[in-house]
From Swiss-Prot:
InterPro entries: METHMP_CycHdrlase
Reactions the enzyme catalyzes: 5,10-methenyl-5,6,7,8-tetrahydromethanopterin + H2O = N(5)-formyl-5,6,7,8-tetrahydromethanopterin + H(+)
Organism: Methylorubrum extorquens (strain ATCC 14718 / DSM 1338 / JCM 2805 / NCIMB 9133 / AM1) (Methylobacterium extorquens)
GO CC field: cytoplasm
The protein's annotated pathway: One-carbon metabolism; formaldehyde degradation; formate from formaldehyde (H(4)MPT route): step 3/5
Entries under Gene3D superfamilies matching the protein: Methenyltetrahydromethanopterin Cyclohydrolase, Chain A, domain 1, Methenyltetrahydromethanopterin Cyclohydrolase, Chain A, domain 2
SUPFAM superfamilies: Methenyltetrahydromethanopterin cyclohydrolase
Pfam families in the cross-refs: MCH
pH effects: Optimum pH is 8.5.
Name of the protein in question: Methenyltetrahydromethanopterin cyclohydrolase
Sequence similarity: Belongs to the MCH family.
Quaternary structure (record): Homodimer.
Gene: mch
Protein backbone atom coordinates (compact mmCIF):
# COMPACT_ATOMS: atom_id res chain seq x y z
CA UNK A 1 0.00 0.00 0.00
CA UNK A 2 1.07 3.59 -0.41
CA UNK A 3 2.16 5.92 2.35
CA UNK A 4 -0.67 8.23 1.26
CA UNK A 5 -3.67 6.24 2.49
CA UNK A 6 -6.04 8.07 0.15
CA UNK A 7 -4.04 7.04 -2.91
CA UNK A 8 -3.89 3.56 -4.45
CA UNK A 9 -0.76 1.42 -4.54
CA UNK A 10 0.74 1.64 -8.01
CA UNK A 11 2.59 -1.63 -7.54
CA UNK A 12 -0.45 -3.51 -6.28
CA UNK A 13 -2.29 -2.43 -9.42
CA UNK A 14 0.59 -2.99 -11.83
CA UNK A 15 1.74 -6.31 -10.35
CA UNK A 16 -0.96 -8.44 -12.02
CA UNK A 17 -0.26 -6.70 -15.34
CA UNK A 18 3.42 -7.64 -15.07
CA UNK A 19 2.59 -11.26 -14.28
CA UNK A 20 0.13 -11.40 -17.18
CA UNK A 21 2.80 -10.04 -19.53
CA UNK A 22 5.23 -12.73 -18.39
CA UNK A 23 2.59 -15.47 -18.66
CA UNK A 24 1.83 -14.40 -22.24
CA UNK A 25 5.48 -14.04 -23.25
CA UNK A 26 5.31 -16.63 -26.02
CA UNK A 27 2.34 -15.15 -27.83
CA UNK A 28 3.66 -11.62 -27.38
CA UNK A 29 7.09 -12.70 -28.70
CA UNK A 30 8.98 -11.78 -25.53
CA UNK A 31 11.99 -13.39 -23.84
CA UNK A 32 11.81 -13.80 -20.06
CA UNK A 33 15.04 -14.55 -18.21
CA UNK A 34 16.89 -14.23 -14.90
CA UNK A 35 19.87 -11.91 -15.28
CA UNK A 36 22.08 -10.55 -12.52
CA UNK A 37 19.60 -11.84 -9.98
CA UNK A 38 16.56 -10.01 -11.38
CA UNK A 39 13.79 -11.08 -13.71
CA UNK A 40 14.12 -9.47 -17.15
CA UNK A 41 11.63 -9.22 -19.99
CA UNK A 42 13.13 -8.51 -23.41
CA UNK A 43 10.35 -6.92 -25.45
CA UNK A 44 12.30 -5.84 -28.50
CA UNK A 45 16.08 -6.22 -28.29
CA UNK A 46 16.74 -9.88 -29.11
CA UNK A 47 13.03 -10.63 -28.94
CA UNK A 48 10.75 -9.61 -31.81
CA UNK A 49 8.10 -8.19 -29.50
CA UNK A 50 4.77 -6.80 -30.70
CA UNK A 51 2.50 -3.78 -30.70
CA UNK A 52 0.29 -5.55 -28.16
CA UNK A 53 3.29 -6.01 -25.88
CA UNK A 54 3.99 -2.28 -26.16
CA UNK A 55 0.38 -1.46 -25.33
CA UNK A 56 0.49 -3.64 -22.23
CA UNK A 57 3.90 -2.31 -21.19
CA UNK A 58 2.46 1.21 -21.40
CA UNK A 59 -0.28 0.20 -18.96
CA UNK A 60 2.41 -1.14 -16.62
CA UNK A 61 4.25 2.18 -16.97
CA UNK A 62 1.03 3.89 -15.85
CA UNK A 63 1.10 1.82 -12.67
CA UNK A 64 -2.20 0.14 -13.48
CA UNK A 65 -3.95 3.51 -13.20
CA UNK A 66 -4.62 3.98 -16.90
CA UNK A 67 -5.84 2.24 -20.02
CA UNK A 68 -4.08 2.15 -23.36
CA UNK A 69 -5.93 1.14 -26.51
CA UNK A 70 -5.28 1.13 -30.24
CA UNK A 71 -8.13 2.84 -32.08
CA UNK A 72 -8.76 2.52 -35.85
CA UNK A 73 -9.42 6.22 -36.30
CA UNK A 74 -7.52 9.33 -35.34
CA UNK A 75 -6.88 12.99 -36.06
CA UNK A 76 -4.18 12.33 -38.70
CA UNK A 77 -6.08 10.87 -41.65
CA UNK A 78 -3.10 9.29 -43.40
CA UNK A 79 -2.07 7.46 -40.21
CA UNK A 80 -5.41 6.37 -38.74
CA UNK A 81 -4.27 3.83 -36.16
CA UNK A 82 -4.02 5.75 -32.94
CA UNK A 83 -2.73 5.11 -29.42
CA UNK A 84 -5.33 6.31 -26.92
CA UNK A 85 -4.42 6.79 -23.25
CA UNK A 86 -6.84 7.52 -20.43
CA UNK A 87 -6.43 7.85 -16.68
CA UNK A 88 -8.85 8.84 -13.93
CA UNK A 89 -5.80 9.76 -11.84
CA UNK A 90 -3.44 11.22 -14.44
CA UNK A 91 -1.10 12.97 -12.02
CA UNK A 92 -0.21 9.81 -10.12
CA UNK A 93 -0.34 7.56 -13.19
CA UNK A 94 1.73 9.80 -15.45
CA UNK A 95 4.06 11.69 -13.13
CA UNK A 96 4.15 9.21 -10.26
CA UNK A 97 4.76 6.19 -12.47
CA UNK A 98 5.02 6.61 -16.25
CA UNK A 99 7.41 9.54 -16.40
CA UNK A 100 10.94 8.35 -17.25
CA UNK A 101 12.59 10.26 -14.44
CA UNK A 102 15.07 7.79 -12.94
CA UNK A 103 18.51 7.98 -14.53
CA UNK A 104 20.22 4.58 -14.42
CA UNK A 105 23.81 4.15 -15.60
CA UNK A 106 26.51 1.51 -15.19
CA UNK A 107 28.83 3.39 -12.84
CA UNK A 108 30.98 0.39 -11.93
CA UNK A 109 31.61 -1.45 -15.19
CA UNK A 110 32.54 -0.48 -18.73
CA UNK A 111 29.31 -1.52 -20.44
CA UNK A 112 28.29 2.07 -21.18
CA UNK A 113 24.76 1.16 -20.19
CA UNK A 114 22.41 4.08 -19.65
CA UNK A 115 18.63 4.16 -19.51
CA UNK A 116 15.85 6.20 -18.00
CA UNK A 117 13.62 4.17 -15.72
CA UNK A 118 9.86 4.52 -15.71
CA UNK A 119 7.05 2.61 -14.07
CA UNK A 120 5.90 1.80 -10.54
CA UNK A 121 9.40 1.00 -9.26
CA UNK A 122 10.09 4.74 -9.21
CA UNK A 123 7.39 5.20 -6.57
CA UNK A 124 9.08 2.67 -4.28
CA UNK A 125 12.56 4.16 -4.63
CA UNK A 126 11.37 7.81 -4.56
CA UNK A 127 14.86 9.05 -5.47
CA UNK A 128 13.38 11.99 -7.42
CA UNK A 129 12.43 15.33 -5.85
CA UNK A 130 9.12 15.11 -7.70
CA UNK A 131 7.74 12.70 -5.09
CA UNK A 132 7.98 15.36 -2.40
CA UNK A 133 5.58 17.47 -4.44
CA UNK A 134 3.30 14.54 -5.10
CA UNK A 135 3.35 13.53 -1.43
CA UNK A 136 3.44 9.89 -2.46
CA UNK A 137 5.52 6.83 -1.68
CA UNK A 138 4.55 3.25 -2.41
CA UNK A 139 5.47 0.24 -0.30
CA UNK A 140 5.73 -3.04 -2.16
CA UNK A 141 7.21 -6.52 -1.90
CA UNK A 142 7.74 -6.73 -5.67
CA UNK A 143 8.10 -4.05 -8.30
CA UNK A 144 8.86 -3.38 -11.96
CA UNK A 145 10.75 -0.84 -14.05
CA UNK A 146 10.49 -0.20 -17.77
CA UNK A 147 13.69 0.77 -19.60
CA UNK A 148 13.98 2.21 -23.10
CA UNK A 149 17.05 0.12 -23.85
CA UNK A 150 18.48 -2.40 -26.24
CA UNK A 151 20.00 -4.53 -23.48
CA UNK A 152 19.26 -5.85 -20.03
CA UNK A 153 20.60 -3.82 -17.10
CA UNK A 154 24.07 -4.82 -15.85
CA UNK A 155 24.66 -6.00 -12.29
CA UNK A 156 25.53 -2.51 -11.03
CA UNK A 157 22.18 -1.11 -12.17
CA UNK A 158 20.25 -4.08 -10.78
CA UNK A 159 21.99 -3.61 -7.44
CA UNK A 160 21.36 0.15 -7.49
CA UNK A 161 17.64 -0.39 -8.02
CA UNK A 162 17.50 -3.12 -5.38
CA UNK A 163 19.20 -0.86 -2.84
CA UNK A 164 16.96 2.12 -3.62
CA UNK A 165 13.75 0.10 -3.41
CA UNK A 166 14.84 -2.00 -0.45
CA UNK A 167 13.97 -5.14 -2.37
CA UNK A 168 16.04 -8.17 -3.29
CA UNK A 169 16.95 -8.30 -7.00
CA UNK A 170 14.74 -11.35 -7.52
CA UNK A 171 11.74 -9.22 -6.55
CA UNK A 172 12.39 -6.66 -9.27
CA UNK A 173 11.32 -7.10 -12.90
CA UNK A 174 13.06 -5.09 -15.62
CA UNK A 175 11.12 -4.77 -18.87
CA UNK A 176 13.17 -3.35 -21.72
CA UNK A 177 12.79 -2.56 -25.41
CA UNK A 178 14.63 -0.18 -27.75
CA UNK A 179 12.76 2.63 -29.49
CA UNK A 180 13.35 0.91 -32.84
CA UNK A 181 11.14 -2.03 -31.87
CA UNK A 182 7.39 -2.54 -32.20
CA UNK A 183 6.86 -2.58 -28.44
CA UNK A 184 9.33 0.20 -27.78
CA UNK A 185 7.81 2.65 -30.23
CA UNK A 186 4.28 1.88 -29.04
CA UNK A 187 5.02 2.50 -25.37
CA UNK A 188 6.78 5.78 -26.18
CA UNK A 189 3.83 7.13 -28.19
CA UNK A 190 1.63 6.14 -25.24
CA UNK A 191 3.34 8.94 -23.29
CA UNK A 192 1.21 11.56 -25.04
CA UNK A 193 -0.82 12.24 -21.88
CA UNK A 194 2.26 12.11 -19.66
CA UNK A 195 4.06 14.90 -21.54
CA UNK A 196 1.00 17.11 -21.09
CA UNK A 197 1.09 16.46 -17.34
CA UNK A 198 4.81 17.18 -17.30
CA UNK A 199 4.23 20.48 -19.11
CA UNK A 200 1.46 21.39 -16.64
CA UNK A 201 3.91 20.73 -13.81
CA UNK A 202 6.65 22.73 -15.53
CA UNK A 203 4.47 25.82 -15.97
CA UNK A 204 3.40 25.67 -12.32
CA UNK A 205 -0.22 24.59 -12.65
CA UNK A 206 -1.65 23.18 -9.41
CA UNK A 207 -1.51 19.42 -10.02
CA UNK A 208 -4.20 18.77 -7.41
CA UNK A 209 -6.67 20.50 -9.73
CA UNK A 210 -6.16 18.00 -12.57
CA UNK A 211 -8.97 15.46 -12.21
CA UNK A 212 -8.94 13.36 -15.36
CA UNK A 213 -7.17 13.15 -18.67
CA UNK A 214 -7.17 11.49 -22.05
CA UNK A 215 -4.72 11.69 -24.92
CA UNK A 216 -4.13 10.26 -28.37
CA UNK A 217 -1.34 10.16 -30.93
CA UNK A 218 -0.81 8.25 -34.19
CA UNK A 219 0.94 4.90 -33.89
CA UNK A 220 4.37 5.56 -35.36
CA UNK A 221 5.90 2.96 -37.68
CA UNK A 222 9.18 1.63 -36.25
CA UNK A 223 12.48 2.36 -37.96
CA UNK A 224 15.74 0.36 -37.64
CA UNK A 225 17.79 3.53 -37.20
CA UNK A 226 17.65 4.85 -33.62
CA UNK A 227 17.58 8.55 -34.57
CA UNK A 228 14.78 8.02 -37.08
CA UNK A 229 12.83 5.81 -34.67
CA UNK A 230 13.20 8.36 -31.88
CA UNK A 231 12.19 11.11 -34.28
CA UNK A 232 9.02 9.32 -35.31
CA UNK A 233 7.84 8.62 -31.77
CA UNK A 234 8.47 12.23 -30.79
CA UNK A 235 6.76 13.59 -33.91
CA UNK A 236 3.70 11.43 -33.25
CA UNK A 237 3.20 13.41 -30.05
CA UNK A 238 4.66 16.82 -30.97
CA UNK A 239 2.76 17.14 -34.25
CA UNK A 240 -0.01 14.52 -34.01
CA UNK A 241 -0.79 14.33 -30.30
CA UNK A 242 -3.97 15.64 -28.72
CA UNK A 243 -4.94 15.72 -25.04
CA UNK A 244 -7.94 16.78 -23.03
CA UNK A 245 -7.57 17.57 -19.34
CA UNK A 246 -10.47 18.07 -16.94
CA UNK A 247 -9.58 20.52 -14.20
CA UNK A 248 -11.15 21.91 -11.05
CA UNK A 249 -10.11 25.44 -11.94
CA UNK A 250 -11.66 28.69 -13.06
CA UNK A 251 -11.86 29.68 -16.70
CA UNK A 252 -8.83 31.95 -16.65
CA UNK A 253 -6.54 29.21 -15.34
CA UNK A 254 -8.01 26.59 -17.68
CA UNK A 255 -7.57 28.87 -20.69
CA UNK A 256 -4.00 29.69 -19.74
CA UNK A 257 -3.12 26.01 -19.31
CA UNK A 258 -4.57 25.16 -22.73
CA UNK A 259 -2.35 27.81 -24.25
CA UNK A 260 0.77 26.75 -22.31
CA UNK A 261 0.71 22.99 -22.93
CA UNK A 262 1.12 22.56 -26.72
CA UNK A 263 4.39 22.09 -28.56
CA UNK A 264 3.63 25.24 -30.56
CA UNK A 265 4.97 27.20 -27.56
CA UNK A 266 8.48 26.01 -28.46
CA UNK A 267 10.89 27.96 -30.63
CA UNK A 268 12.01 24.62 -32.10
CA UNK A 269 8.51 23.73 -33.32
CA UNK A 270 8.08 23.33 -37.07
CA UNK A 271 10.48 20.61 -38.26
CA UNK A 272 10.63 16.82 -37.86
CA UNK A 273 12.37 15.89 -34.62
CA UNK A 274 15.21 14.00 -36.32
CA UNK A 275 16.02 17.18 -38.25
CA UNK A 276 16.01 19.24 -35.05
CA UNK A 277 18.21 16.64 -33.34
CA UNK A 278 20.71 16.80 -36.19
CA UNK A 279 20.67 20.60 -36.10
CA UNK A 280 21.89 20.57 -32.47
CA UNK A 281 24.47 17.84 -33.20
CA UNK A 282 22.66 15.31 -31.04
CA UNK A 283 22.73 17.42 -27.88
CA UNK A 284 19.33 17.02 -26.20
CA UNK A 285 20.06 19.89 -23.86
CA UNK A 286 20.13 22.32 -26.77
CA UNK A 287 16.53 21.45 -27.70
CA UNK A 288 13.89 23.69 -26.15
CA UNK A 289 12.16 21.59 -23.48
CA UNK A 290 8.80 23.15 -24.38
CA UNK A 291 8.85 21.11 -27.60
CA UNK A 292 8.20 17.84 -25.75
CA UNK A 293 4.45 18.34 -25.59
CA UNK A 294 1.34 17.29 -27.50
CA UNK A 295 0.40 19.28 -30.58
CA UNK A 296 -3.00 20.28 -29.28
CA UNK A 297 -4.58 20.67 -25.85
CA UNK A 298 -8.17 20.98 -24.72
CA UNK A 299 -8.69 21.97 -21.10
CA UNK A 300 -12.18 21.71 -19.62
CA UNK A 301 -13.14 23.49 -16.41
CA UNK A 302 -15.52 21.29 -14.44
CA UNK A 303 -16.44 24.40 -12.44
CA UNK A 304 -18.00 26.17 -15.41
CA UNK A 305 -18.30 23.53 -18.11
CA UNK A 306 -16.29 25.63 -20.55
CA UNK A 307 -13.47 24.19 -22.65
CA UNK A 308 -10.44 25.99 -24.02
CA UNK A 309 -8.06 25.02 -26.81
CA UNK A 310 -4.46 25.64 -27.63
CA UNK A 311 -2.00 24.51 -30.28
CA UNK A 312 -2.72 22.75 -33.55
CA UNK A 313 -2.13 19.45 -35.28
CA UNK A 314 0.49 19.37 -38.04
CA UNK A 315 -0.38 16.28 -40.14
CA UNK A 316 2.05 17.27 -42.89
CA UNK A 317 4.94 17.05 -40.42
CA UNK A 318 3.71 13.65 -39.21
CA UNK A 319 3.71 12.53 -42.85
CA UNK A 320 7.21 13.90 -43.41
CA UNK A 321 8.45 11.95 -40.40
CA UNK A 322 6.63 8.65 -40.92
CA UNK A 323 7.22 7.99 -44.63
Amino acid sequence: MSSNTSAPSLNALAGPLVESLVADAAKLRLIVAQENGARTVDAGANARGSIEAGRRIAEICLGGLGTVTIAPIGPVASWPYTVVVHSADPVLACLGSQYAGWSLADEEGDSGFFALGSGPGRAVAVVEELYKELGYRDNATTTALVLESGSAPPASVVNKVAAATGLAPENVTFIYAPTQSLAGSTQVVARVLEVALHKAHTVGFDLHKILDGIGSAPLSPPHPDFIQAMGRTNDAIIYGGRVQLFVDADDADAKQLAEQIPSTTSADHGAPFAEIFSRVNGDFYKIDGALFSPAEAIVTSVKTGKSFRGGRLEPQLVDASFV
